[in-house]
Amino acid sequence: MAIVKVKPTSPGRRAMVKVVNKELHKGKPYAPLLDSQSSTAGRNNNGHITTRHKGGGHKHHYRVVDFRRNKDGIAAKVERLEYDPNRSANIALVLYADGERKYIIAPKGLTVGQQLMSGSEAPIRAGNTLPIRNIPVGTTIHCIEMLPGKGAQMARSAGTSAMLLAREGIYAQVRLRSGEIRRVHVECRATIGEVGNEEHSLRQIGKAGANRWRGIRPTVRGVAMNPVDHPHGGGEGKTAAGRDPVSPWGTPAKGYRTRSNKRTTSMIVQRRHKR
């Protein structure tokens, strides 16, 4: 994997920085594990915008990734590494001994031909998936389940990982990259190591059009709007907001906590916030 600064042949390419991985498969993805997906452009079933700054972008297939990793005791061989347009991490196509192929999140250091295993008897090696009950304390893990059997939900992005801190009864404590310490059931599964493509955060888009290719529309500042559109809008000429930063609906924008899921609050041992 290499970081390439593009030659400044145009203003759009002058600031562009790419992450190039020559180990990625250059052909088409594995067709049986592809699914179609349509863009909603941030609209709900009524046609109202529920997520701003979305729309356009290149069409792409969804890669069906195996987040459960529940084929216990069956060895799998890494056939190839692939780019996935739906996520920041790369994915790996693995071939199980029974002939089935699946996509998984590619951990750091994964190579073509490497053997992987799932289950409580799997060795502690990067890319193997085990119940947290069988993982040594202090191990770096990723693709962590929040409910047993539901599939990985935490630490799935490029370069992310978590650390197993302790086990107490039926729960274990995991420190996430954000600093949050969370309790998870010891029967939840996690994969050893950290997610690959860790240089993803070093790339520079270079121009606005590259974000439009990704389906990201422009973000307009509130002070540039009219009063009817945003609490910061209006004024004669170029004026300040005149109040603390808020969202278009008046919710404080800087550090205001909006989490309302009280049902799982008891699973958070330490919040990611400093205060």
Swiss-Prot record:
InterPro entries, A to Z: NA-bd_OB-fold, Rib_uL2_dom2, Ribosomal_uL2, Ribosomal_uL2_bac/org-type, Ribosomal_uL2_C, Ribosomal_uL2_CS, Ribosomal_uL2_dom3, Ribosomal_uL2_RNA-bd_dom
* Comp. bias intervals (Polar residues): 35-49
**Entry keyword set:** Ribonucleoprotein, Ribosomal protein, RNA-binding, rRNA-binding
Task: Provide ranges: composition bias, Basic residues.
Answer: 50-59
**Gene3D superfamilies reported for this sequence:** 2.30.30.30, Nucleic acid-binding proteins (2.40.50.140), Ribosomal protein L2, domain 3 (4.10.950.10)
The UniProt entry's GO biological process terms, in alphabetical order, are: cytoplasmic translation
**Which residues lie within the region annotated Disordered?**
29-59, 224-275
In which domain of life is the source organism classified? Bacteria
So what family is this one in? Belongs to the universal ribosomal protein uL2 family.
From the Swiss-Prot or TrEMBL record, give the protein name: Large ribosomal subunit protein uL2
Source gene? rplB
